[in-house]
Design a protein with these regions (language model features):
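Structural preference for solvent-exposed beta-strand-turn elements
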Residues: 1-302
Length: 302
Protein backbone atom coordinates (compact mmCIF):
# COMPACT_ATOMS: atom_id res chain seq x y z
CA UNK A 1 0.00 0.00 0.00
CA UNK A 2 1.24 3.48 -0.83
CA UNK A 3 -0.77 6.65 -0.31
CA UNK A 4 -0.01 10.38 -0.14
CA UNK A 5 -1.96 12.76 2.12
CA UNK A 6 -1.93 16.43 3.01
CA UNK A 7 -0.55 16.34 6.56
CA UNK A 8 -3.07 18.71 8.16
CA UNK A 9 -6.03 16.98 6.51
CA UNK A 10 -4.91 13.57 7.75
CA UNK A 11 -4.10 14.85 11.24
CA UNK A 12 -7.51 16.55 11.43
CA UNK A 13 -9.14 13.20 10.65
CA UNK A 14 -7.01 11.16 13.06
CA UNK A 15 -7.26 13.33 16.20
CA UNK A 16 -11.06 12.95 16.76
CA UNK A 17 -10.66 9.17 16.40
CA UNK A 18 -8.29 8.83 19.36
CA UNK A 19 -11.24 8.89 21.77
CA UNK A 20 -12.73 5.74 20.24
CA UNK A 21 -9.49 3.75 20.13
CA UNK A 22 -9.05 1.20 22.89
CA UNK A 23 -5.93 1.74 25.01
CA UNK A 24 -3.86 -1.13 26.45
CA UNK A 25 -6.20 -3.83 25.18
CA UNK A 26 -5.33 -7.49 24.80
CA UNK A 27 -6.59 -7.21 21.21
CA UNK A 28 -3.88 -5.23 19.41
CA UNK A 29 -6.08 -4.50 16.39
CA UNK A 30 -8.44 -2.18 18.29
CA UNK A 31 -5.53 -0.07 19.55
CA UNK A 32 -5.04 1.14 15.99
CA UNK A 33 -6.75 2.88 13.10
CA UNK A 34 -7.57 0.86 10.02
CA UNK A 35 -6.48 2.64 6.84
CA UNK A 36 -8.18 1.23 3.72
CA UNK A 37 -7.89 2.65 0.22
CA UNK A 38 -11.05 3.41 -1.74
CA UNK A 39 -11.95 5.28 -4.87
CA UNK A 40 -10.70 8.85 -4.54
CA UNK A 41 -9.09 8.45 -1.13
CA UNK A 42 -8.98 6.39 2.05
CA UNK A 43 -11.40 5.26 4.72
CA UNK A 44 -10.16 5.45 8.32
CA UNK A 45 -11.89 3.27 10.94
CA UNK A 46 -11.54 3.07 14.72
CA UNK A 47 -13.60 0.85 17.05
CA UNK A 48 -13.23 -0.13 20.72
CA UNK A 49 -16.10 -2.67 20.59
CA UNK A 50 -18.51 -0.15 22.16
CA UNK A 51 -18.12 3.01 20.11
CA UNK A 52 -16.39 3.79 16.84
CA UNK A 53 -15.86 6.20 13.99
CA UNK A 54 -15.44 6.03 10.24
CA UNK A 55 -13.91 8.95 8.33
CA UNK A 56 -13.26 9.46 4.64
CA UNK A 57 -10.13 11.41 3.67
CA UNK A 58 -9.07 12.46 0.21
CA UNK A 59 -5.59 11.34 -0.85
CA UNK A 60 -3.53 10.13 -3.79
CA UNK A 61 -3.62 6.33 -3.95
CA UNK A 62 -0.56 4.87 -5.66
CA UNK A 63 -1.02 1.29 -4.45
CA UNK A 64 -4.17 -0.18 -2.88
CA UNK A 65 -4.27 -1.95 0.47
CA UNK A 66 -5.64 -1.95 4.00
CA UNK A 67 -3.62 -2.03 7.21
CA UNK A 68 -3.97 -1.19 10.90
CA UNK A 69 -1.58 1.47 12.23
CA UNK A 70 -1.16 2.25 15.93
CA UNK A 71 -3.35 5.29 16.61
CA UNK A 72 -1.25 6.92 19.33
CA UNK A 73 2.04 6.67 17.41
CA UNK A 74 0.41 7.79 14.17
CA UNK A 75 -0.97 10.96 15.78
CA UNK A 76 2.34 11.72 17.52
CA UNK A 77 4.27 11.34 14.26
CA UNK A 78 1.86 13.50 12.27
CA UNK A 79 2.09 16.27 14.88
CA UNK A 80 5.88 16.59 14.51
CA UNK A 81 6.12 16.20 10.73
CA UNK A 82 6.43 19.41 8.68
CA UNK A 83 3.37 20.73 6.84
CA UNK A 84 2.89 19.45 3.33
CA UNK A 85 2.66 16.01 1.74
CA UNK A 86 2.88 12.88 3.92
CA UNK A 87 3.53 9.48 2.36
CA UNK A 88 2.40 6.27 4.05
CA UNK A 89 3.86 3.10 2.57
CA UNK A 90 3.53 -0.50 3.80
CA UNK A 91 5.76 -3.30 2.51
CA UNK A 92 5.25 -7.06 2.34
CA UNK A 93 6.68 -7.47 5.87
CA UNK A 94 3.91 -5.21 7.29
CA UNK A 95 6.38 -2.42 8.03
CA UNK A 96 4.78 0.98 7.55
CA UNK A 97 6.95 3.94 6.60
CA UNK A 98 5.59 7.42 7.28
CA UNK A 99 7.64 10.15 5.62
CA UNK A 100 7.56 13.84 4.81
CA UNK A 101 10.51 15.76 3.38
CA UNK A 102 13.72 14.53 5.01
CA UNK A 103 11.88 13.00 8.00
CA UNK A 104 10.68 9.39 8.12
CA UNK A 105 9.43 6.91 10.71
CA UNK A 106 8.92 3.15 10.60
CA UNK A 107 6.30 1.22 12.56
CA UNK A 108 4.87 -2.27 12.54
CA UNK A 109 1.40 -2.55 10.99
CA UNK A 110 -1.24 -5.26 11.22
CA UNK A 111 -3.20 -6.60 8.25
CA UNK A 112 -6.60 -4.97 7.83
CA UNK A 113 -8.28 -8.37 8.09
CA UNK A 114 -7.43 -8.40 11.83
CA UNK A 115 -9.73 -5.43 12.45
CA UNK A 116 -13.08 -6.28 14.12
CA UNK A 117 -16.16 -6.27 11.93
CA UNK A 118 -18.05 -3.00 12.29
CA UNK A 119 -21.81 -3.04 12.95
CA UNK A 120 -24.06 -2.25 10.02
CA UNK A 121 -24.21 1.54 9.85
CA UNK A 122 -27.91 1.72 9.02
CA UNK A 123 -31.01 1.98 11.18
CA UNK A 124 -34.75 1.35 11.03
CA UNK A 125 -35.60 4.76 12.51
CA UNK A 126 -34.02 7.99 11.35
CA UNK A 127 -34.23 11.68 12.19
CA UNK A 128 -32.21 14.85 11.67
CA UNK A 129 -31.50 17.40 14.41
CA UNK A 130 -29.46 20.60 14.62
CA UNK A 131 -25.99 19.95 16.01
CA UNK A 132 -26.16 23.02 18.27
CA UNK A 133 -29.51 21.86 19.68
CA UNK A 134 -28.20 18.37 20.44
CA UNK A 135 -25.01 19.81 21.93
CA UNK A 136 -27.05 22.07 24.22
CA UNK A 137 -29.15 19.17 25.49
CA UNK A 138 -26.17 16.93 26.22
CA UNK A 139 -24.24 19.70 27.98
CA UNK A 140 -27.20 20.46 30.25
CA UNK A 141 -27.43 16.91 31.64
CA UNK A 142 -23.92 15.42 31.46
CA UNK A 143 -22.99 16.53 34.99
CA UNK A 144 -25.51 14.10 36.51
CA UNK A 145 -24.40 10.98 34.59
CA UNK A 146 -23.16 8.24 36.94
CA UNK A 147 -19.71 6.65 36.60
CA UNK A 148 -19.37 2.87 36.98
CA UNK A 149 -22.74 2.55 38.71
CA UNK A 150 -23.96 -1.06 39.15
CA UNK A 151 -27.24 0.05 37.54
CA UNK A 152 -26.16 0.32 33.89
CA UNK A 153 -28.88 2.74 32.82
CA UNK A 154 -27.53 5.41 35.20
CA UNK A 155 -24.20 5.45 33.36
CA UNK A 156 -25.85 7.13 30.39
CA UNK A 157 -28.34 9.75 29.22
CA UNK A 158 -31.92 8.77 28.43
CA UNK A 159 -33.35 10.44 25.30
CA UNK A 160 -37.00 10.57 24.28
CA UNK A 161 -38.09 12.02 20.92
CA UNK A 162 -41.82 12.70 20.68
CA UNK A 163 -42.82 14.75 17.65
CA UNK A 164 -40.60 17.84 17.67
CA UNK A 165 -39.96 17.63 21.43
CA UNK A 166 -36.72 16.10 22.69
CA UNK A 167 -36.16 15.15 26.34
CA UNK A 168 -32.79 14.24 27.87
CA UNK A 169 -32.51 12.81 31.40
CA UNK A 170 -29.58 11.77 33.59
CA UNK A 171 -29.38 10.63 37.21
CA UNK A 172 -26.48 9.45 39.40
CA UNK A 173 -28.66 8.52 42.44
CA UNK A 174 -27.79 11.87 44.05
CA UNK A 175 -28.73 14.32 41.31
CA UNK A 176 -31.26 14.31 38.51
CA UNK A 177 -31.01 16.52 35.43
CA UNK A 178 -33.76 16.97 32.84
CA UNK A 179 -33.66 19.07 29.69
CA UNK A 180 -36.70 19.29 27.43
CA UNK A 181 -36.95 21.50 24.38
CA UNK A 182 -38.60 21.76 21.00
CA UNK A 183 -36.13 21.14 18.20
CA UNK A 184 -36.11 21.52 14.45
CA UNK A 185 -36.48 17.82 13.67
CA UNK A 186 -36.95 16.00 10.39
CA UNK A 187 -38.03 12.43 11.04
CA UNK A 188 -38.98 9.44 8.89
CA UNK A 189 -40.68 7.79 11.89
CA UNK A 190 -44.01 8.98 13.29
CA UNK A 191 -43.95 7.28 16.69
CA UNK A 192 -42.06 8.00 19.88
CA UNK A 193 -38.37 7.05 19.97
CA UNK A 194 -36.28 6.47 23.10
CA UNK A 195 -32.78 5.19 23.84
CA UNK A 196 -29.98 5.38 26.44
CA UNK A 197 -26.49 6.43 25.35
CA UNK A 198 -23.37 5.82 27.48
CA UNK A 199 -21.81 8.88 29.08
CA UNK A 200 -18.36 8.01 27.68
CA UNK A 201 -19.76 7.91 24.16
CA UNK A 202 -21.47 11.27 24.60
CA UNK A 203 -18.18 12.81 25.75
CA UNK A 204 -16.68 11.86 22.39
CA UNK A 205 -19.80 12.94 20.48
CA UNK A 206 -19.58 16.43 22.00
CA UNK A 207 -16.15 16.85 20.40
CA UNK A 208 -17.73 16.34 16.97
CA UNK A 209 -20.84 18.49 17.30
CA UNK A 210 -20.64 21.93 15.70
CA UNK A 211 -21.86 25.07 17.45
CA UNK A 212 -23.15 26.63 14.23
CA UNK A 213 -26.88 27.10 13.87
CA UNK A 214 -26.91 25.79 10.29
CA UNK A 215 -25.22 22.43 10.97
CA UNK A 216 -27.30 19.29 11.41
CA UNK A 217 -26.63 15.61 12.01
CA UNK A 218 -28.61 12.60 10.79
CA UNK A 219 -29.24 10.04 13.54
CA UNK A 220 -30.16 6.44 12.76
CA UNK A 221 -31.38 3.97 15.39
CA UNK A 222 -30.53 0.31 14.83
CA UNK A 223 -31.26 -2.68 17.06
CA UNK A 224 -28.20 -2.32 19.30
CA UNK A 225 -26.41 0.77 18.00
CA UNK A 226 -27.14 4.39 17.22
CA UNK A 227 -25.38 6.06 14.30
CA UNK A 228 -24.56 9.77 13.91
CA UNK A 229 -23.98 10.61 10.26
CA UNK A 230 -21.97 13.80 9.72
CA UNK A 231 -20.90 15.26 6.39
CA UNK A 232 -17.64 13.30 6.05
CA UNK A 233 -17.62 11.04 9.10
CA UNK A 234 -19.82 8.58 10.96
CA UNK A 235 -19.81 8.14 14.74
CA UNK A 236 -21.61 5.15 16.23
CA UNK A 237 -22.09 3.72 19.70
CA UNK A 238 -23.73 0.78 21.37
CA UNK A 239 -26.87 1.74 23.30
CA UNK A 240 -27.36 0.73 26.94
CA UNK A 241 -29.81 -2.17 26.78
CA UNK A 242 -31.96 -1.44 29.82
CA UNK A 243 -35.17 0.25 30.86
CA UNK A 244 -34.61 3.68 32.38
CA UNK A 245 -35.73 4.54 35.90
CA UNK A 246 -39.14 6.12 36.43
CA UNK A 247 -37.54 9.53 36.89
CA UNK A 248 -40.79 11.50 36.85
CA UNK A 249 -41.80 10.17 40.27
CA UNK A 250 -38.76 11.95 41.77
CA UNK A 251 -39.96 15.33 40.50
CA UNK A 252 -42.48 16.93 42.92
CA UNK A 253 -45.85 17.69 41.38
CA UNK A 254 -46.38 20.62 43.73
CA UNK A 255 -43.92 22.90 45.53
CA UNK A 256 -44.39 24.99 48.67
CA UNK A 257 -41.34 27.17 48.13
CA UNK A 258 -40.39 29.13 45.02
CA UNK A 259 -37.21 31.20 44.95
CA UNK A 260 -35.91 33.49 42.22
CA UNK A 261 -32.22 34.39 42.41
CA UNK A 262 -29.80 36.16 40.04
CA UNK A 263 -27.79 33.50 38.21
CA UNK A 264 -24.26 34.94 38.24
CA UNK A 265 -24.07 35.84 41.97
CA UNK A 266 -25.58 32.44 42.85
CA UNK A 267 -23.01 30.59 40.72
CA UNK A 268 -20.14 32.54 42.28
CA UNK A 269 -21.44 31.79 45.78
CA UNK A 270 -21.80 28.09 44.97
CA UNK A 271 -18.26 28.01 43.62
CA UNK A 272 -16.87 29.56 46.81
CA UNK A 273 -18.86 27.21 49.02
CA UNK A 274 -17.82 24.13 47.05
CA UNK A 275 -14.13 24.75 47.78
CA UNK A 276 -14.51 23.28 51.26
CA UNK A 277 -17.20 20.69 50.56
CA UNK A 278 -15.88 18.63 47.67
CA UNK A 279 -15.00 15.04 48.38
CA UNK A 280 -14.58 12.05 46.12
CA UNK A 281 -17.01 9.17 46.55
CA UNK A 282 -16.75 6.26 44.10
CA UNK A 283 -15.05 8.51 41.57
CA UNK A 284 -17.69 11.23 41.72
CA UNK A 285 -17.67 14.62 43.38
CA UNK A 286 -20.26 15.12 46.13
CA UNK A 287 -20.85 18.61 47.53
CA UNK A 288 -23.25 18.80 50.51
CA UNK A 289 -24.47 22.36 50.98
CA UNK A 290 -26.92 24.03 53.36
CA UNK A 291 -29.27 26.66 51.94
CA UNK A 292 -31.06 28.99 54.36
CA UNK A 293 -33.91 31.08 52.98
CA UNK A 294 -35.09 34.24 54.71
CA UNK A 295 -37.02 37.20 53.37
CA UNK A 296 -34.99 38.70 50.53
CA UNK A 297 -31.90 36.64 51.35
CA UNK A 298 -30.36 33.27 50.53
CA UNK A 299 -27.45 32.11 52.71
CA UNK A 300 -25.16 29.27 51.62
CA UNK A 301 -23.08 27.46 54.21
CA UNK A 302 -20.78 24.45 54.06
Amino acid sequence: MKIIFEKNELLGAVLPMLGVVSAKNTIAAIEGIKVATEEGGCMLSAFDNEKGMVTHVGCEVIEDGEYIIGASKLSQILRVLPDGKVTIEVNERNVVKISSGISSFELHALPGSDFPVLPELRGDKEFTIGQAELRDMINKVMFAVAVNDPKPMLNGVYFVIDGDTVTAVSCDSQRLALRRRRCSLESSYDGEMSFILPGKSLTELLKLLDTGEDSSVCIMIARKHIIFNFENKVFFTRMIDSNYIEYERFIPKTNRIFVKAPVDPLLRSLERASLVTEEKTMGQTKSPLRCTFTEGKLALSS
